[in-house]
Amino acid sequence: MRRSFLADYILYTVVRFLAVLFRLLPLRFSLWIGRRFGDVLYYLFGNRRLIAYANLKAAFGGRYTPAQLKGIIKSECHNLSQSFIEVLKFPVFGNEYVDKYIKVEGEDKIKAALKRGRGVILLTGHFGNWELSSLVGALRGYKMNVLARWQKFDMLNGYLNKMRSFRGANVVSKGDSREMIMRALNRNEIAGILSDQDGGKRGEYVKFFGRLASTPKGVAHFSLKTGAPILPVFIIRQKGPYHRLVIEEDISITASDDINVDIHEILQRFAKVLQMYVERYPGQWLWIHKRWKTTPTKYVLVLSDGKAGHLKQSLSVANAFNEVRVESGYAPRDTKIETLEVKFKNRFVRTLFELFSVLGVGLNRLSFCFTSRAFDDIKSRYADFIISCGSSLTGVNLSLKKEFNAKSIVIMKPNIHNVNKYDLAIIPTHDRPELRSNVVVTKGAVADINKASFERYASELRKNINITKDNIIGVLIGGDSKTYILQPELINSILDEVL
């Protein structure tokens, strides 16, 4: 507790000092410094930067090059740093600032909505400098109630809330938000709410960039219970200190007999509008957040080296993963399994790729190792899980794991890569693997053997062979090799499975 208090006090003191400093500096120069902070922030983010990159890949696929994706993340860092400085300068921002730097579009929609006497919900996301929306509203004379999440550090949180409320906005903490927001709407006031972060297992799943995203239900409940209209609001940073604040059309609906359907409809409408703005201005949204953290939809990418046996083993693991998820309550459609054939230009560059990937050289710098079509295919993919079988794909597996911030599964013992780098390694006994927490040892090759697969294989066999009672089907089991001898126990267990 003492350490937490000390960290809180230090951060609070530093922020207070920065606030005094930036209020003395001209706005443009302050924001220039903010962009330099953003450059530093980009490198400090570390794992968050990987999350942002993976989110962008999931959302846009191959629409942007890797360099463009990194540029979007840098723009996000610039926007966050500039927004923070603008919040610190709130006490010196007045109507003159708003008139000069912020162009408001659609304010008539707020005035018309307030005439209904049921309050208004201004709904936005972590987009642009969303904090400015409440400042503009308060300076325009509206009674603003802003819902804010309580942050980790009490002193710093209290100071930031003081900045938010400096021009008259009422900051509502999430602990007592339900009752206070309802009262504000019943008084025909405005409630400002952000609703674009992961809603956990209790959230409502809506489509967002083609994936199901859990979304908090609160805003829909407020509207349905009070009849308050919901106006999506987005503030776009144009250039430097200039912004454009856009108020969109009402997305609320009249309550029906099925509240669950109503909630879904409202949240899906907002997700659609939010996606439209994020697509237009990708560098102004908060990609570093795990937006799809609790999504039921998982993408599995199976890598193929062109060898049927290797591909079959990888698909067996992918299908088993799907079966486990179905047993856990997910629908079969929630697991998307795709296959990607990896084609190197020749054996030499394949070996080169393995060597450089061990040294940590990124996938994009090694693009020359692949055929142009193969690399274009790789760039367009996204996955939560990577599965591969065979030594030629071990480096590609790890490279894609880093590219997508995904989980990696390798079948067979990696040649030169450390097995600890994989989340799961499935290795047969004859490869003599070391026993580790991420290693599963098998007696033989992985096979897709279950009741459903047997029925599928039997159906395929009947199409090609006229099976009668007089026909006998033989089973051939591979023999010994230089490094492995088939044991009687293994043969008997295989025969038990077959017969």
What does each model-found stretch correspond to?
Residues 1-124, 157-162, 168, 354:
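Membrane-anchoring hydrophobic helices of lipid-metabolizing enzymes
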Residues 100-103, 419-487:
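A nucleotide-sugar donor-handling region in carbohydrate enzymes
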Residues 118, 133, 142, 310-313, ...:
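Conserved catalytic-core segment of nucleotide-activated headgroup transferases in glycan assembly
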Residues 16, 20, 26, 151-152, ...:
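Active-site and donor-binding regions of nucleotide-sugar-utilizing enzymes
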Residues 32-35, 280, 298-327:
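N-terminal phosphate-binding or glycine-rich loops at protein starts, especially the Walker A/P-loop
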Residues 116-175, 201-204, 331, 419:
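Catalytic core of membrane glycerolipid acyltransferases/transacylases, capturing the structured
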Residues 190, 299, 384-385, 424, ...:
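Structural motif
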Residues 2, 6, 71-74, 114, ...:
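Non-catalytic C-terminal accessory region of glycerolipid acyltransferases
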